Amino acid sequence: MGRKSKFELFVQILLTAAVIFFGITLTNALDRNRREMAELRKAIAAMPRQTVNIVQKTTEPQTEEKSALAQYYQPDAPAGGVLRSAIASDTGSLNPVTGNEATASAILAMCTAPLGTRDLRHPEKLLPLSAESWQTSDNGKRINIKLRKGMMFHSFTDPESGKFVPEKEVTAHDVVFYVDVIRNSQVNAGALRSYFKDLGSIRAVNDYELELVWKEEYFRSLEMSLSLIPLPRHFYMPDGKFDPVKFNDDYRRNDMIVGHGAYKLVKHIKDQRYELERFENYFGKALGIAPAVQKRILEIVKADNTRFQMLLSGELDMLGVSADQWVKRTNGKEFAAKVITVGDKAADVPLQNGEKFRKVKHLANAYFYIGYNQRKKPFDDKLVRKAMTLLCNRERILKEVYHNQGRIISGPFFCDSPYYDKTIKPLPFDPKAAAELLKKANWADRDGDGILDKDGKKFVFTALQVSGNPVQEKILSIFKEDLAAAGIDMKIATLEWPVYIGKLDKHDYEVCSLGWSLPYESDPYQVWHSSQAENAGGSNHIGFVNSKADKLIEAIRKTFDDEKRIKLCKKFHKLIHEEQPYTFLVVPERLQIISGKLNNVECFPLGLNSDCFVIGGRN
């Protein structure tokens, strides 16, 4: 569901449901759900897991001078330098409410800061960021948040008037404005809006204090409250009036970011690059959490081979790579032999004998799947859906596409989290069992042409794939081959990303292949609840409607006791496994290469945090 590590965007910045990304796009983007959440990694299971009731936690105002996160930074490190990375595609919008793509998440994560974040080494702990402190009452339904004073929005030049607008202080009213915009039914924020449907009210007590009252008890109410960001009223309604239609479609403002975070967007050349510079009045400087790197450049390069060559030539300092590149191209003398995994630091892998790059590897907090639109026949039949999964050779996909850099899964939770039921094994590749199910569903080759038919209709359908995505292309090619052997004709339509997303938003497709990033604490509501099935642009785009699932989801949301919630999640996992609305594919390893010139690098449970990086200096 990368916006990276500032509250689940550090794991996921705007809690938008599912930044959907595939293969190399995932490895390059900061984790965020599409229309929704920046994202649990492999080592969380190895950690002494503390599933805590974060909704009932309280923080007292911080009296120390530094943030608890300051221990991960090097405040005395030499400031300066340029950090160059690459992303696979540009975005249509940088609007923090309506933007829904991985690229937007990545840029926004650097330019703004939510009220709270997670501790980098102990992500079960919530820490203040733009907030100074908070208190909860009434079983987590009432949350009072105190903002830091002196936080400043970046200056900007108004795209309409051409007038320069200086820095302006952030207030609680800007956070209220963010929520008001999300909840405006005319704003294109359907997926994000669903997360706040149970928020009864939010008000600014004064310029620096907020009060939120949730209508229902919700185990993520504190987390969701701390995910909020201030939205600059003076930028989005310079005349004092809010126009939701203009907010959606104002391409000039939606190509800008006015945040209050560590970096300021200074240049965007469409389909070429983004340039960001350190914001010298960033409030994090006084807390010891200001980045040392002066400038960030994100090159937009569609071809993965071109990106890799740029890394080798020194044009890039860090790069997410495909499993194919990892296995075939990172074993040369330029690359350190030891791989950095969760808990390791760059200092643990000293470079020697001409080595220029370090390798970083950990499970991504995301999964890929093949989804079946249950509004379309024959995918309204769970016998057919189960047969489809039995005809998907996931072991072959893991081996040939991912080079065994990942894990096959059976359900919708992160596979190393306590919510995932490890007793439920993925269905095997079993064409014989699939044939029996299809026969039971009355599919047979009645005219001997090699294609199954039922009620005079052939078993022919179209699966969508994204142009220029080699991982997805390989997966669907393998699937097509196995389906053909079973008498099923799968056509493949290759679409550009905006067209692809448009098809999903309108539910105008039969089968798709996508991926979800996952928040730290999972809530299946947005992707799986029946109420989300008909939302245009919503995350339940496959139209999964199941009353038993709805009851479980609603119970999960209201259960604060961790062990009880885990049991409910495992029941939900079992139900999804029985229904097979998706063919769950793989949780991939997140594979990254970083230049030897980058220091203060650590692989945290939720991945790398490039804000901590130092160019030169000590490790």
Q: Locations of the language-model features?
A:
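Gly/Pro-rich hinge or "lid" segments in bacterial periplasmic/extracellular proteins
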Residues: 113, 119-121, 207, 226-291, ...
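Ligand-site clamp/hinge motif
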Residues: 249-254, 281-344, 480, 489-491, ...
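Ligand/substrate-recognition segments at binding pockets and active sites
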Residues: 48-51, 85, 270-271, 289, ...
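Alpha-helical secondary-structure segments
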Residues: 171-176, 207, 211-213, 261-262, ...
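Surface-exposed binding/hinge segments that line
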Residues: 187-241, 264-267
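N-terminal lobe/hinge region of extracytoplasmic solute-binding protein
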Residues: 68-71, 81-138, 180, 258-260, ...
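Detector for C-terminal structural segments
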Residues: 23, 27, 36, 67, ...
